[in-house]
Structures are given as structure tokens and as C-alpha cells.
Amino acid sequence: MKVRASVKEMCDKCRVIRRNGRVMVICTNPKHKQRQG
């Protein structure tokens, strides 16, 4: 899980979602998991 100020999709499998008011990226590749913070 990467914590970043700006979250971006890194591949075509990445999806930007909102969870509990947080912007997150979920992906089949665990290296691409990100959270805004």
C-alpha cells in the first residue's frame, strides 16, 4: 500500500474508488495499491 498525495491509475486493471471518504486505487497487482493521505 502506497500513501500518496496524488493517486493515479498505473495500469489498465487499476480502479480508483472512494472508501470512507478516502480515495484509493485497487488493482490485481498488489504493488499498485494506493491510498490518498
Swiss-Prot record:
InterPro entries: Ribosomal_bL36, Ribosomal_bL36_sp. One of its GO terms (biological process) is translation. Keywords: Organellar chromatophore, Plastid, Ribonucleoprotein, Ribosomal protein. Its main location: plastid. GO terms for molecular function: structural constituent of ribosome. Pfam families: Ribosomal_L36. It is found in: Plastid, Organellar chromatophore. The keyword Hydrolase does not apply. This is Large ribosomal subunit protein bL36c. It comes from Paulinella chromatophora.
